[in-house]
Design a protein with these regions (language model features):
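Conserved hydrophobic/aromatic pocket- or pore-lining residues that grip, position, or stack substrates
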Residues: 64, 68, 95, 106
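Hydrophobic/aromatic-rich core segments of domains that either
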Residues: 97-169
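Catalytic cysteine-centered active-site loop
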Residues: 75-85, 92, 113-123
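N-terminal accessory/pre-domain segments preceding catalytic cores
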Residues: 1-55, 170-272
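Secondary-structure capping and boundary motifs in well-ordered enzyme cores
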Residues: 90-94, 98
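Short, well-ordered strand-loop elements centered on a beta-strand within folded domains, enriched
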Residues: 17-22, 86, 90, 135-141
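Secondary-structure boundary elements
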Residues: 32-87
Length: 272
């Protein structure tokens, strides 16, 4: 966070490169850096106190994702938004800050994590590549903060898990890493949020799906998201629960119906 870039000098003999010197561009003095690091360390210690260092990889990754998505505001005007100061000191950031903070916290928890730069929906973006239980996945913490979409549906308490531990194929529906970045192909699904939480359906079973929504409604959850294996199942669920309003058969007393669609990831979210 105390370096904004670098300059370099090439030394050649004839046409042969013999040496290369890099000089960082510092953004603060050493004393300022130490003071800022102390502030960051204090916040990070408070955050990590909420998770057992011996917890399973999935639990650690979800804890970090949940914390950042819930407690750090998305703001394009946030100061220092290209580094972790924006997150741990100011509490507001953009995609680069979310990705850098996710990496910082996960590496503190001994989970390998890298920041990936590229585009999402055609706009410059940053997210993470993580290794959970020996397998690689993608995580986009920025998109976990549902207010990022700015659709004004009262989403302050909602966490969007549609890009928590996804495969390369799922990611590439909306995200594209820069061409100069070499990343592994992510194929594992065990630690995907919907698979891990039993919210993933690959066959149509109205009652089983409806009972998932019912359980969330009856225990007072504000939202419930279910993911389907393909577009056909997703559209079948949308028609059944939303168009035909069969959700009221499972959620007794529900007087209004609000929902979120994600046809890219085949996720149907109902707000209670």
């Amino acid at each position: 966070f105390w370096v904004s870039g670098y300059t370099y000098t090439q030394y050649t003999r004839g046409e042969k490169l013999v040496d290369l010197h890099f000089t960082p561009k510092f953004t603060m003095t050493d004393a300022e850096r130490m003071d800022m690091q102390a502030q960051i360390d204090e916040t990070v210690s408070q955050i990590l106190a909420g998770i057992d260092a011996q917890a399973p990889d999935y639990d650690k990754a979800k804890y970090v994702f949940d914390y950042l998505a819930s407690n750090v505001a998305y703001s394009t005007g946030a100061p220092d938004n290209q580094n972790i100061i924006s997150v741990f000191v100011n509490g507001e950031t953009v995609c680069q800050g979310y990705a850098a903070a996710t990496q910082y916290l996960l590496e503190k928890l001994d989970i390998p994590c890298a920041v990936v730069a590229g585009t999402a929906d055609g706009q410059s973006h940053a997210w993470n590549l993580v290794k959970l239980d020996g397998e690689y996945y993608y995580i986009d913490t920025t998109w976990g903060n549902a207010t990022y979409s700015g659709d004004g549906m009262g989403l302050d308490s909602f966490i969007n898990y549609n890009y928590f531990a996804v495969t390369t194929g799922e990611l590439q529906k909306t995200h594209q890493p820069n061409d100069d970045i070499i990343v592994p192909v992510c194929q594992a699904v065990k630690d995907n949020y919907y698979v891990h939480e039993n919210l993933y359906f690959d066959t149509w079973d109205a009652d089983s799906i409806g009972n998932v929504y019912r359980a969330a409604y009856e225990q007072g959850d504000g939202f419930c998201s279910v993911r389907f294996a393909d577009r056909e199942l997703y559209e079948q669920a949308f028609t059944y629960f939303i168009t035909d309003q069969k959700i009221v058969h499972y959620c007794k007393g529900l007087t209004s119906l609000y929902y979120l669609e994600d046809s890219d990831q085949n996720v149907l979210t109902i707000k209670f």
